[in-house]
């Protein structure tokens, strides 16, 4: 959402101080299917109409491949997936292209995030609603939430929906939890290692079978902030 609004401002010449600029998408390899569809069907054609192209960078391995190689579940504290899957690929790309200033799509409602980065939306006091208005005025549909389909910060309803509509992906996480527990032992509290909150995949699988509760959007943990790349 925010990055799309920032791109609109750049394309429309509202941020001339950053000319010339390039738009780079850091693809973790595990983005939500809806994100890939939006980029393909809306964002990239819109950029092309304005004579711009989207540059895509990727890590050497997807974040899930990395977890599987290390035999660990995603960490809600270390946030290594953001660093390895998002930040490092972009930093390598920028360095390989002669360096430059990185503009981050953080809005004014998230001013506490990445205070050491250049954040035009924060500087212009544009919040999430403002971003939505900018995108709508441009004639683009809302990109919706972004983030990885396996993100440890997913909301309750999102985890249950994954178990319902894409059981193959869900079971991949279930296997990862089992392997992580077998390899590294249980958590300090004696419970198995988990990807989403303090409940194992079996719990979410059971809830998914109890009926349509897609609209349960509570957070997995009230004291656990979102990661740096999950826009939910």
What are these language model-derived features?
Residues 1-232:
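Nucleotide-activated chemistry modules centered on ATP-dependent adenylation/adenylyltransferase
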């Amino acid at each position: 959402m925010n990055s799309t609004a920032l791109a609109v401002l750049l394309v429309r010449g509202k941020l001339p101080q950053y000319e010339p600029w390039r738009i780079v998408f850091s693809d973790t390899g595990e983005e939500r299917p809806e994100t890939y569809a939006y980029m393909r069907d809306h964002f990239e054609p819109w950029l092309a109409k304005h004579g711009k192209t989207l540059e895509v960078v990727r890590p050497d391995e997807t974040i899930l491949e990395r977890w599987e190689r290390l035999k660990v579940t995603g960490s809600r504290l270390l946030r290594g997936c953001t660093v390895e899957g998002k930040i490092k690929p972009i930093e390598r790309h920028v360095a390989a292209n002669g360096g430059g200033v990185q503009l981050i799509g953080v809005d004014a409602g998230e001013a506490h995030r990445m205070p050491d980065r250049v954040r035009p939306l924060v500087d212009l006091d544009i919040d999430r609603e403002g971003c939505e208005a900018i995108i709508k005025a441009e004639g683009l549909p809302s990109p919706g939430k972004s983030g990885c389909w396996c993100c440890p910060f997913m909301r309750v309803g999102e985890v249950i929906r994954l178990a319902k509509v894409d059981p193959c992906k869900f079971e991949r996480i279930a296997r990862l939890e089992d392997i992580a527990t077998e390899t590294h032992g249980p958590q300090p509290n004696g419970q198995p290692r988990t990807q989403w909150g303090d409940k194992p995949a079996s719990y979410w699988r059971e809830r998914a079978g109890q009926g349509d509760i897609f609209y349960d959007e509570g957070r997995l943990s009230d004291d656990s902030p979102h990661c740096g790349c999950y826009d939910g």
